[in-house]
Swiss-Prot record:
Residues the record lists as N6-(pyridoxal phosphate)lysine modifications: K209
Quaternary organization: Homodimer.
Residue ranges crossing the lipid bilayer per the database entry: none
Encoding gene, per UniProt annotation: hisC
Protein name in UniProt: Histidinol-phosphate aminotransferase
Pathway: Amino-acid biosynthesis; L-histidine biosynthesis; L-histidine from 5-phospho-alpha-D-ribose 1-diphosphate: step 7/9
Biological process (GO), any one: L-histidine biosynthetic process
Length: 346
């Protein structure tokens, strides 16, 4: 059966999500999920009908939250579908390319490679910022540039002046996609205000992180209306199931937003607790994180990751040497993880 697959698919290495990697334990801090399991109400009376392509109540609710016009919002099956739509809509297979800056989220390359679009990489600088001269030198045939901020897995914010420089150099050349999956934890760092000046800017958002709805698979693309209309040409006819739209709209209600903001304060306190406890350990470096996770460098990251795994504490190994990414859980999970790591290192 493998030989019947397209050559690009045969050569493809699938993205190994936290769930695919697996593990067994009672502390799961490997997928940047929220520890809060919130309850929602759902009306089962409409399940015999297809959903609307872009449910107005959901679009209007997210537009109000993001402070944009409803015409500037597209909803999809997670931000991952937004990535795929952008590549499919703007890149010609076997002709165009995307560009991204590792270490960063792995689905940019997967989405491109799946449909035969070349991937170009320009690594981040030593302080995990954009290498603008190298990006500019690599823009030939590039139609989409992906930038993640806060970046996954490093946790840092990309300098705003560099984003502006990137937007200027890509005018009339490429779409710039800001992946803001974790921006709810630092909304003041969003680039949404730049949409008014840059028609080639697209912004990815999700309800998976701060809104504690990873299992719902509901994401958004923010852009100017002309770009959104291009994406609407290639999106599936019923991308957002009725239950997803209804629950997401509840999460974006006044009560839902108040709960989300309260829970983010709790997570911020737990992140500070975890960071402070790790920083005092010998040989440990904790990088500043703006999302719901921390990137931590150990004397031997692989051994810490494996020992925690064997102990039922599931963390996320990193492609960065000796680094482990730790999601911020509830206080009990953070205490258990910190205590285990302390015992390993002292």
């Amino acid at each position: 059966m493998e030989k019947l697959a397209r050559k690009q698919v045969q050569a493809l290495t699938p993205y190994l999500s936290a769930r695919r990697i697996g593990g067994s334990g009672d502390v799961w801090l490997n997928a940047n999920e929220s520890p809060f399991d919130n309850e929602y109400q759902f009306n089962f009376a409409r399940l015999n009908r297809y959903s609307e392509c872009q449910p107005p109540e959901l679009i209007n609710a997210y537009a109000a939250y993001a402070k944009v016009k409803p015409e500037q919002v597209l909803t999809s099956r997670g931000a991952d579908e937004g990535i795929e739509l952008l590549v499919r809509a703007f890149c010609e297979p076997n002709q165009d390319a995307i560009l991204y800056c590792p270490p960063t989220y792995g689905m940019y390359s997967i989405s491109a490679e799946t449909i035969g679009v070349e991937t170009k990489t320009v690594p981040l600088t030593s302080n995990w910022q954009l290498d603008l001269p190298a990006i500019e030198a690599s823009l030939e045939n590039v139609k989409v540039v992906f930038v993640c901020s806060p970046n996954n897995p490093t946790g840092n914010i990309v300098d705003r002046k560099d984003i502006l420089s990137l937007l200027e150099m890509t005018k009339d050349r490429a779409i710039v996609v800001m992946d803001e999956a974790y921006i709810d934890f630092c909304m003041e760092k969003s680039t949404v205000d730049l949409l008014v000046d840059y028609p080639h800017l697209a912004i990815l958002r999700t309800l998976s992180k701060a809104f504690a709805l990873a299992g719902l698979r509901c994401g958004f693309t923010l852009a100017n209306e002309e770009l959104i209309n291009v994406l609407l040409k290639v999106i599936a006819p019923y991308p957002v199931p009725v239950p997803v739209a209804e629950i997401a709209t509840q999460a974006l209600s006044e009560a839902g937003l108040a709960r989300m903001k309260y829970q983010m304060l709790d997570l911020s306190a737990n992140r500070a607790y975890l960071q402070a406890g790790l920083m005092v350990l010998p040989g440990v470096t904790v990088f500043e994180g703006w999302g719901n996770y921390l990137l931590v460098k150990f004397p031997d990251g692989d051994s810490v990751f494996k020992a925690a795994w064997d102990h039922g504490i599931i963390l996320r190994n990193s492609p960065i040497e000796n680094c482990v990414r730790i999601s911020v859980g509830n206080r009990e999970e953070c205490e258990k993880t910190l205590g285990f790591i302390r015992n390993q290192l002292i």
